[in-house]
Amino acid sequence: MVYKISVIAVCIAALAIVLMVKAYTGPDEPPMALDEHTYATITPLEFDKCCAMWLILRFVDAHAVFKVYPQGTYLAGPRVFDVGGATWSRQHRKCTSDCIWDDLNVNDGAAERIVLMAHQIELNRWHLDQFPQAQQADNELRQIIEQNPDPNDCIKLTMEYFDTLYAQLRTVSRGAQNRSVMGA
């Protein structure tokens, strides 16, 4: 009896190991190939993911095209973002936008403030009331996402949203610089 139980336990352990290895290494089919300017991610769309798209389009690849696949789709490769295992994905105390921004090494105060908003929204969701500008931006973007279920339409509108937000933040930054130069 003890022998049978031992054999069953060993078989169950072996099966568990096989399943864990399978889950860790991904499915049998290879990841889908992406065209040169195509970047891929999975649903759902949210502030950090849309901010990451905007950063890619404005600072990495002006010809970027985004493909959004259903959650659970196996994606891998150099132009995959905000999915497990991707270089540009949430890691410890960094959101996806933080990871992209760190790689860019760009000095742009307005863009950096947008990335900071993404960070606050992604990592401080339960304390967002402490960051009113980020909270407002999150609410505005959520409204765009909810009203536009088609990912392509939604991406177009969110890129316009981030361009507008960027222009507003640049104007505020320039105004502050002008006041400091004038001694105000």
Spell out what each predicted region is:
Residues 1-7:
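Feature marks short, highly hydrophobic, charge-poor N-terminal signal-anchor/signal peptide-like helices
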Residues 24-36:
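Ser/Thr/Pro/Gly-rich low-complexity linker/stalk segments immediately outside membranes or between
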Residues 33-36, 53, 61, 71-92:
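Conserved non-transmembrane functional hotspots
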Residues 67-69:
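A short, structured beta-strand/loop element
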Residues 78-115:
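A recognition module on extended beta-rich or small alphabeta surfaces enriched in W/G with H and D/E
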